């Protein structure tokens, strides 16, 4: 929006041409989203408290979590508001990738909002029935996948890239839609499963989003892409503005979500942010790198799958409780220790993901 204004004003003063630079708009985007989160956060927390929109807690969970009951939830709406405003202000709104990621994020956020709302109204932790949640996730995920497939301008946009193996490129064809669906929906649910402790999900999300922003910038620049032997996706660089907004909004939310949390993001935030990460990774053809950098999300998801499969097949549980962060809590780890150690793991995995840029 402001880019259009800057382009108009450039005819009167050439200095406005500086807004053409992605790096500047990325910096302004992160600062805008961060400021909005910090500014609106206290107001949103008070509003949620007044309306008694509090977290429902599982009775079979760790006993330490019973004290969290009633903590304001649905704070993810704050993150999405900051992301949307910052992106609309600083991104090039003629770029289709910006709209795809923003729309997918908000649609998955809508699913989470309905889920959270039902939890608040019914005063239990079940929320929206799983079949309906997965149905709408599938509708929106497939819709995004089909759109990206139909609007692909170059073959590389539907090719699977294997990091560290520069000669391995797999033409997916229509299977691109299938892969994209699983990446978007899988990422959405993985982040949601991780969101069980104060600040546990948001910080890894911020770190992965920041790294994906780097991939977006490099992939959108033909010279950098050729030098690093990564896919050149014209227009993908504009997504650095969205990624920066996510980083800023996430850090602003963490100010209130850090232990002991004043507010939880709820499904409205977790489902949306996970879908955003998945969609961005698909666009820049870095699905495998997302799998690496989001290793904490993968670990949380696998722990649930293993736990369910083991119990159904043998009647025994592998972990004391799933997702795995609860397993460590029941082993006696204090909540802050679990959180920070998972953050450290994410830092390492993100660095490994970034290292794939040179390991070719």
From Swiss-Prot:
Cofactor(s) needed for function: Mg(2+)
One GO-annotated biological process of the protein: cell division
Keyword Zinc (UniProt): no
Cellular localisation: Cell inner membrane
Annotated membrane topology: Multi-pass membrane protein
InterPro entries: Glycosyl_transferase_4, PNAcMuramoyl-5peptid_Trfase, PNAcMuramoyl-5peptid_Trfase_CS
EC class (word): transferase
Gene Ontology MF, one: UDP-N-acetylmuramoyl-L-alanyl-D-glutamyl-meso-2,6-diaminopimelyl-D-alanyl-D-alanine:undecaprenyl-phosphate transferase activity
EC numbers, comma separated: 2.7.8.13
UniProt pathway: Cell wall biogenesis; peptidoglycan biosynthesis
Entry GO CC: plasma membrane
Keywords assigned: Cell cycle, Cell division, Cell inner membrane, Cell membrane, Cell shape, Cell wall biogenesis/degradation, Magnesium, Membrane, Metal-binding, Peptidoglycan synthesis, Transferase, Transmembrane, Transmembrane helix
Catalyses which reaction(s): UDP-N-acetyl-alpha-D-muramoyl-L-alanyl-gamma-D-glutamyl-meso-2,6-diaminopimeloyl-D-alanyl-D-alanine + di-trans,octa-cis-undecaprenyl phosphate = di-trans,octa-cis-undecaprenyl diphospho-N-acetyl-alpha-D-muramoyl-L-alanyl-D-glutamyl-meso-2,6-diaminopimeloyl-D-alanyl-D-alanine + UMP
PROSITE patterns the UniProt entry points to: MRAY_1 (PS01347), MRAY_2 (PS01348)
Record field: transmembrane: 25-45, 73-93, 97-117, 142-162, 167-187, 199-219, 236-256, 263-283, 288-308, 338-358
Pfam families given in the database record: Glycos_transf_4 (PF00953)
Predominant location: membrane
Family: Belongs to the glycosyltransferase 4 family. MraY subfamily.
Task performed by this protein: Catalyzes the initial step of the lipid cycle reactions in the biosynthesis of the cell wall peptidoglycan: transfers peptidoglycan precursor phospho-MurNAc-pentapeptide from UDP-MurNAc-pentapeptide onto the lipid carrier undecaprenyl phosphate, yielding undecaprenyl-pyrophosphoryl-MurNAc-pentapeptide, known as lipid I.
Protein name: Phospho-N-acetylmuramoyl-pentapeptide-transferase
Annotated source species: Pseudomonas aeruginosa (strain ATCC 15692 / DSM 22644 / CIP 104116 / JCM 14847 / LMG 12228 / 1C / PRS 101 / PAO1)
Lineage: Bacteria, Pseudomonadati, Pseudomonadota, Gammaproteobacteria, Pseudomonadales
